[in-house]
Curated annotation (Swiss-Prot):
Pathway(s) where this gene product acts: Protein modification; protein lipoylation via endogenous pathway; protein N(6)-(lipoyl)lysine from octanoyl-[acyl-carrier-protein]: step 1/2
One GO term of the biological process aspect: protein modification process
Site (described: Lowers pKa of active site Cys): K154
GO annotations of cellular component type: cytoplasm
Protein name: Octanoyltransferase
Coiled-coil portions: none
Comment field (misc): In the reaction, the free carboxyl group of octanoic acid is attached via an amide linkage to the epsilon-amino group of a specific lysine residue of lipoyl domains of lipoate-dependent enzymes.
Function in brief: Catalyzes the transfer of endogenously produced octanoic acid from octanoyl-acyl-carrier-protein onto the lipoyl domains of lipoate-dependent enzymes. Lipoyl-ACP can also act as a substrate although octanoyl-ACP is likely to be the physiological substrate.
Organism: Methylibium petroleiphilum (strain ATCC BAA-1232 / LMG 22953 / PM1)
GO molecular function: lipoyl(octanoyl) transferase activity
Family recorded in the similarity comment: Belongs to the LipB family.
PROSITE patterns hit by this protein: BPL_LPL_CATALYTIC, LIPB
Gene3D superfamilies referenced in this protein's UniProt entry, alphabetically: Bira Bifunctional Protein, Domain 2
InterPro entries per the UniProt record, alphabetical: aa-tRNA-synth_II/BPL/LPL (IPR045864), BPL_LPL_catalytic (IPR004143), Octanoyltransferase (IPR000544), Octanoyltransferase_CS (IPR020605)
Length: 224
């Protein structure tokens, strides 16, 4: 069965969370996989590992508890959020391989814009070398224990939930957004981690195009 792609536009986070959870709870072996692409109004979301101390000053931005993995992150306009609703058992892969494919889809999307995306062991998501986001060298290292994130910027966040072999939640790619809300949190629980978007590193991409490109990559990596 072909994956169904849905472009939701700008939608409330909590409403979307409830909808994808309901979809996952009621789907059957015959339900086609879906890929939801959207953006959210400003919101902080806390994953299952989230700690209150990592929300430094939420201010007027709501904080919503979520059942995805990970800690606190931010969603807002100018960010492409992708929610793949996938039957992993039918696809024939386990969670570790699923996460690898999600990250690979982001890496290949960035590659299309000339940007080199990197994985960081133990820190899900995709990162760029702030000194040379277009080069093919490794990230700066070894890390300085006083500033372990020096020279590294996070450009995509990832957090998933798997229930009855089926995934929901997903990933967020920063395209052209107001990044100042990230200063109100320790992104993903990491103090000092800088968050960037494509615009910050000199890649002027329209979020609609980025959503289409990311959607294409996700479909290619998550289809049988």
């Amino acid at each position: 069965m072909a994956m169904q792609r849905r472009r939701l536009g700008r939608v409330d986070y909590a409403t979307t969370f409830d909808a994808m959870r309901a979809f996952t709870e009621t789907r059957t072996p015959g339900t086609p996989d879906e890929l939801w692409l959207c953006e959210h109004p400003p919101v902080f979301t806390q994953g299952l590992a989230g700690k209150a101390e990592h929300v430094l000053d939420a201010g007027d931005i709501p904080v919503v508890a979520s059942n995805r993995g990970g800690q606190v992150t931010y969603h807002g306009p100018g960010q492409v959020v992708a929610y793949p609703l996938i039957d992993l058992q039918a696809l024939g892969i386990f969670v570790k391989e699923y996460v690898f494919r999600l990250e690979q889809a982001v890496i290949k999307t960035l590659e299309g814009y000339g940007v080199t995306g990197h994985r960081v062991t133990g820190a899900p998501g995709i990162y760029v070398n702030l000194c040379d986001p277009f080069g093919h060298g490794a990230l700066p290292g070894p890390p300085d224990p006083r500033d372990p994130w020096r020279g590294i910027g996070k450009i995509a966040a990832l957090g998933i939930k798997v229930s009855r072999h089926c995934s929901y939640h997903g990933l967020a790619l920063n395209v052209a957004m107001d990044l100042s809300p990230y200063e109100r949190i320790n992104p993903c629980g990491y103090a000092g981690l800088r968050t960037v978007d494509l615009s910050t590193i000199g890649v002027p991409v329209d979020p609609e195009r980025a959503a289409a490109d990311l959607g294409d990559r996700l479909e290619s990596y998550l289809s049988p």
